[in-house]
Amino acid sequence: MKREYQDAGGSGGDMGSSKDKMMAAAAGAGEQEEEDVDELLAALGYKVRSSDMADVAQKLEQLEMAMGMGGVGGAGATADDGFVSHLATDTVHYNPSDLSSWVESMLSELNAPPAPLPPATPAPRLASTSSTVTSGAAAGAGYFDLPPAVDSSSSTYALKPIPSPVAAPSADPSTDSAREPKRMRTGGGSTSSSSSSSSSMDGGRTRSSVVEAAPPATQASAAANGPAVPVVVVDTQEAGIRLVHALLACAEAVQQENFSAAEALVKQIPMLASSQGGAMRKVAAYFGEALARRVYRFRPPPDSSLLDAAFADLLHAHFYESCPYLKFAHFTANQAILEAFAGCRRVHVVDFGIKQGMQWPALLQALALRPGGPPSFRLTGVGPPQPDETDALQQVGWKLAQFAHTIRVDFQYRGLVAATLADLEPFMLQPEGDDTDDEPEVIAVNSVFELHRLLAQPGALEKVLGTVRAVRPRIVTVVEQEANHNSGTFLDRFTESLHYYSTMFDSLEGAGAGSGQSTDASPAAAGGTDQVMSEVYLGRQICNVVACEGAERTERHETLGQWRSRLGGSGFAPVHLGSNAYKQASTLLALFAGGDGYRVEEKDGCLTLGWHTRPLIATSAWRVAAAAAP
């Protein structure tokens, strides 16, 4: 059947004098219509009124979507011919200059129902939280660069062996029949998947989002007659829910040693993470890498080479600059040490992890400004051996000695090389050639993010605390991550670390946005070099927490309550840090870019620093209990 378009202004029969009146009226209407016609489109031969522009644009967009769904990807011309069969060569559309009517006629042809698909055996439903399947030939044509195709009918991909509590049940497809169709951008090839719903709890509020998809018959036919269909993501919220569910389901599969199911989920995680932005995408990428290392049993190597040792120091320095966590740790510990040294003429600090010595210039300067003059200051720095046998600890001592000389502080330094703190003995920390006629040294022991590493070796922490107790320090300052990554099952540890590092990455994003850094396209320019390197610094911790076990897993963080129990059981009593340290720490954060999101809290005499409502690090001070003193 041919469709003809009749001009509204066409001629009729001979009507005598009435004809002249009608022509005059038509001429007047034509002049009015000519005034309303868009001039730019009229120059191209199309008659479109300015008032009809919005309607024509909407119809063109619908036409483009309908024709674009015809399989412009790897299916080739065959899919196009089958889907747009109503636009055959024998169909004629007259007068395309009247663009509105012409587009409407095209849409009427496209909206005709297609031929029914042949019946096929229904594909198995997935027990996973994700209702997506990866494509083969059309991979990479849509939003994501998709991984290799995974056969959804295989027992590996069907996650039935995992009775995950975090998996969202699939909804009945019949409930979606009355729902209005949504605009979806897809990869190449026809799109179909089962309809599913997911929900997440955010502060006690349940949020749900739904994926619109074709009925199961279409999915079964596509699985039987063509390549696997691409992923269809309606919005980033739905993809984010799927991403979290995939991470948790993969961790549960690892715990159950169902590595075939875990491998299938590991392949989904990068695809789902690529739809996210900001901190969530970065955290998911690091956790996905850590899970992949655990599934494929590819453990991260220890920092044994010269390059790794130098890189670790570089990451630590960038982490110090990008966020206030290390600054807070150094400041609160120094404040406690300064108060303990009040009125003392000879002081000695033992630093269990001196690294680049960034903590001590501030304390030296505070002692130099003390009324009555600075005391004699001795510093013992402990550090690991260097792969190239260089004396890096001595180089740190030279720099600190030069600084102390400029502010006129009597300074002595000694470096102790130890592969682990458990190798230290009490005599190594005692004063050399101590003159009994002089005032005795007052000792302070400082540990920033060091004690948790000892938990990987049975009995190591108890030995180190016994060594500390033997030298009778006036104060012991301890800074540790406020997290529990050292107890429970692997899934519990994974879930806790996912929450912890998500908050940590959020704080980095907030600090970077508050500092007004460059918005160039490159990652280093967009987030700043310090922020990018700090993310790598945290990513290495994530990899150790998730991918490693046994003695290799050194990032065994524990909460403040757990450290209070350990130190109290080893003969130490807590020292209240006081309100002065709290006020000064709050002032320090106010000066830091993006400090609005950071929160300092005082908890049982200890200070914590967190992002919004989540504490992330904690500083505590201790002394040898009277009953435990030798």
UniProtKB/Swiss-Prot annotation:
Region VHIID: start-end pairs: 316-381
Effect of M533K: In strain: cv. F2
Motif (LXXLL motif): 451-455
Impact upon substituting E480K: In strain: cv. H99
Motif (LxCxE motif) on chain: 248-252
Recorded consequence of changing N484S: In strain: cv. NC260
Effect seen on changing T390I: In strain: cv. EP1
GO cellular component terms, A-Z: nucleus
Name of the protein: DELLA protein DWARF8
Species the sequence originates in: Zea mays
Taxonomic classification: Eukaryota, Viridiplantae, Streptophyta, Embryophyta, Tracheophyta
Gene coding for it: D8
